[in-house]
């Protein structure tokens, strides 16, 4: 085959690849929208270079499937643009931080890489394609985690070989984040990524990938303050990307900045709906549920239960999606209904919560856990046992060891409430401590951004029930250190302090609760109790 030319049939095959959305690529190819500024030199024709860089900018904001359309448009205009095939290949993982991905997408990625190599004009472009191949090669035999580490090493070498190629450094930082070990409490890869990204961000403040990946880098409680500046600017850098509107709330949610989280996700939902209305009328864009989950969680912390209920109703009414299915879509669509009953301690509702079919493992585990706790809390440990058995089966069949462990956290906590319902108090406490310790030993996953419920806070609830208020207060305070500004966390700490005879702390926590829920839209019992306590202290 001529290295500079591809048969027309091959080019047509790539241009015909499915993108899981409406096939009108006018928006992708016309230059509409604002996605930030990227400088990525290639050997492609001068005519398509701006189009290619715009496609990369969209890629940096995970605007799937639009970035696929954009790279296809570049190939159509310049079939010899090797890096457009690289773009098409890397785009097959809509969000590279959230596996798994369909095997047919991984296969298409490898095919695109080979076609890119066939037309590559420079050693640098071949090196880019070879590095990317590391994450796709043997996808049907080698686990994702192994391939991610392989890709991390390949991108490290690329960045070392081309120190002036800032995109190589940026994608190396993203490769580090793809390979993060969620049990590593030293945050070694995250800190390394931050050290790469932050200096470049000062040089290229309008680059969408820098703000985006800095947020992901510091999307962990001990690091979150470092991500505030990136969070505050990202939506302005890429205002046309729905994901860019949502991402700041990753930092805001960790820090308990609920109004800011709601603001970000309101914009993200609007952007998602505008996109769906234009590109796939009658569908819900697949990125919307993740944003809605953040929004529901934030509303519940503010005592705005009606707004949270509105969100759960909208999610329950979704009939058809556009865009790719993902772990984040499933958990985002499912979690708010469970949050709505768990945060309100609506145990009868929890016990009867529906379990939709055809979900990723942890997404199915969410309502199963909620039903188990609801059953135990309403005096039906037999039903709780059945749901716990289903959770155990889910843990065994999970997509990988991380999700198996996260489901096991739910197994332990649900088993604790079942033991409590059966009067086995020592067992209950041991199981709940196990759940809290296991959860604390790992980090949350980007596709389940806000943990379903802080298990150390739940340990506080159990200790309070068992008449151990001092220990309960310790548990609540430890939980609030990690899960900041939570309404029930403040309430539990206030009740525990009150029961332990520490009226000063009780007052402080009730004051925090009252301030947090000052704009509550329902008459929460916790808020009534806080107001009554504070009134009596005057």
Map each language-model feature to its residues.
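Residue at a conserved register position within TPR or TPR-like alpha-solenoid repeats
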Residues: 58, 92, 134, 176, ...
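Solenoid-like repeat scaffolds
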Residues: 76, 159-161, 201-203, 233-240, ...
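TPR/TPR-like (Sel1-like) alpha-helical repeat modules
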Residues: 82, 89, 93, 101-118, ...
């Amino acid at each position: 085959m001529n290295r500079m030319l591809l048969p027309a049939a091959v080019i047509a095959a790539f241009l015909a690849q499915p993108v899981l959305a409406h096939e009108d690529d006018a928006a992708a190819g016309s230059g509409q929208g604002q996605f930030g500024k990227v400088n990525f030199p290639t050997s492609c024709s001068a005519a398509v270079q701006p189009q290619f860089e715009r496609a990369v900018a969209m890629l940096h904001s995970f605007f799937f499937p639009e970035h696929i359309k954009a790279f296809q448009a570049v190939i159509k205009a310049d079939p010899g643009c090797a890096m457009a095939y690289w773009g098409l290949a890397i785009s097959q993982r809509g969000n590279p931080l959230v596996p798994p991905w369909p095997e047919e997408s991984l296969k298409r990625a490898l095919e695109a890489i080979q076609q890119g190599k066939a037309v590559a004009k420079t050693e640098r472009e071949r090196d880019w394609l070879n590095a990317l191949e590391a994450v796709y090669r043997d996808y049907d035999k080698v686990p994702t985690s192994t391939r991610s580490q392989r890709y991390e090493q390949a991108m490290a070498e690329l960045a070392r070989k081309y120190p002036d190629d800032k995109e190589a450094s940026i994608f190396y930082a993203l490769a580090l984040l793809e390979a993060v070990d969620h049990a590593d409490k030293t945050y070694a890869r995250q800190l390394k990524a931050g050290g790469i990204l932050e200096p470049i961000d000062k040089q290229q403040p309008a680059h969408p990938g820098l703000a985006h990946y800095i947020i992901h880098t510091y999307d962990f409680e001990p690091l979150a303050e470092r991500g505030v500046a990136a969070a505050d600017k990202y939506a302005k850098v890429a205002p046309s990307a729905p994901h860019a509107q949502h991402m700041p709330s990753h930092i805001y949610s960790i820090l308990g900045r609920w109004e800011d989280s709601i603001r970000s996700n309101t914009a993200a939902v609007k952007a998602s709906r505008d996109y769906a209305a234009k590109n796939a009328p009658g569908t819900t864009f697949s990125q919307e549920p993740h944003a809605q989950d953040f929004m529901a969680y934030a509303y519940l912390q503010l005592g705005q239960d009606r707004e949270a209920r509105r969100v759960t109703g909208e999610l329950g009414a979704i009939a058809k999606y556009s865009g790719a299915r993902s772990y984040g879509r499933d958990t985002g669509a499912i979690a708010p209904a469970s949050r709505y009953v768990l945060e309100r301690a609506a145990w009868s509702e929890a016990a009867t919560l529906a379990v939709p079919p055809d979900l990723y493992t942890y997404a199915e585990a969410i309502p199963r856990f909620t039903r188990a706790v609801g059953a135990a809390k309403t005096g039906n440990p037999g039903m709780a046992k059945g749901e716990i058995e289903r959770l155990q089966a889910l843990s065994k069949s999970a997509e990988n060891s991380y999700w198996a462990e996260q489901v096991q956290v739910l197994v332990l906590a649900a088993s604790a409430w079942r033991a409590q319902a059966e009067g086995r108090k020592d067992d209950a406490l041991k199981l709940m401590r196990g759940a809290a310790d296991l959860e604390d030993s790992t980090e949350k996953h980007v596709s389940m951004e806000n943990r379903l419920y802080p298990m150390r806070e739940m340990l506080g609830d159990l200790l309070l029930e068992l008449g151990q208020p001092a220990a309960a207060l310790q548990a609540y305070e430890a939980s609030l250190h990690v899960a900041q500004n939570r309404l029930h966390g403040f309430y539990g700490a206030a009740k525990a302090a009150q029961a332990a005879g520490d009226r000063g702390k009780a007052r402080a926590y009730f004051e925090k609760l009252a301030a947090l829920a000052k704009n509550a839209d329902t008459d929460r019992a916790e808020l009534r109790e806080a107001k009554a306590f504070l009134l009596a202290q005057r």
